[in-house]
Amino acid sequence: VVLNVETLYNIWSALQGQPVTDTFVTVCGEVKQPATLRLAVGTSIVDALAAAGGVTCENPAIIHGGPVMGSLVESAEAPVTKTTKGLVALPMDHPHVRRMRRPVSVSLERAITACCQCRQCSDLCPRALLGHNIAPHKIMRAAGYALTKDPAVWTAAFLCSECGVCDTFACGADLSPRQVYRSVKAQLAAAGVKNPHKATPTPLEELVYRRVPTERLIWRMGLEPYVMGAPLVREVLLPAVVKVPLKQNAGAVSVPVVKVGERVSRGQLVAEPPPDALGARHHASVTGTVTAVGNEVSIEREA
């Protein structure tokens, strides 16, 4: 089991009876003062960017998470959750943003026209190197031409961790096996197909020789201008309004236990999982008054 520092900190806090009300988030990219901020859960992305000095380009794209495995946010008004660890602002015309916004239909068309089956994506795939039965070049062939009757080629989508090595580093034709796998995985899940791959893998000998150099990855993604320090700001940012989402984790959507107009204290329970369901409790990250209850619990902080 691998635990990051913040997870260990939250475990220690739980042992002291303290719930998770804050999260440490690195805000970087097109911002004036890149920083690692301690944000109250439910802080809007707009407030987080403002705390880093504001954005330095017009109408930026915001990546929630890291640049490789993160996702584009639909609205900068969206709240920070317990699992938010990074916010990366990039120009809307940045090559990596264009890659992330590319529809899967385009990826499929490109698979037909541009994939030369060089298998570079499969040679560098971390999951394949760990011994899993996955070969990204085969899904490109199958999706593009439907030339396989082997169900394992399709169910290998369950083995894809969507790490992004294939499309951000390996492929010289700017194709995205990851996006194709993501689409296949969603279709299999919608059809009720379960992951059939249960074998314990044996890592390949080539694993130690095929690791991706961080510097080269940054260069390939065009992120060199944004490589700089993001110093930790220890003080908690408590905005005027927070919106605590009722679903921030795997499992069921939590049920609110507070009502509009109710006064809550920082750390007070505001939502919990339904009975006999897997989920997580959520707590007020500021002291104030509940102003709305829906998919989120909105709290206006006391002055």
Task: Give each language-model segment a name.
Residues 288-290:
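Conserved hydrophobic positions within beta-strands
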Residues 254-263, 267:
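Short histidine-centered loop motifs in beta-beta connectors
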Residues 203-252, 256-257:
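N-terminal, Lys/Arg-enriched amphipathic/low-complexity engagement segments
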Residues 265-279, 296-299:
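Short hydrophobic beta/alpha edge segments that flank linear recognition/processing sites
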Residues 1-5, 75-106:
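Active-site loop ensemble at the mouth of alpha/beta enzyme cores that anchors a bound cofactor
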Residues 1-43, 51-58, 66-67, 75, ...:
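Hydrophobic alpha-helical positions that pack around
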Residues 90-112, 122, 127-204, 239, ...:
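Ferredoxin-type iron-sulfur electron-transfer modules in oxidoreductases and energy-metabolism complexes
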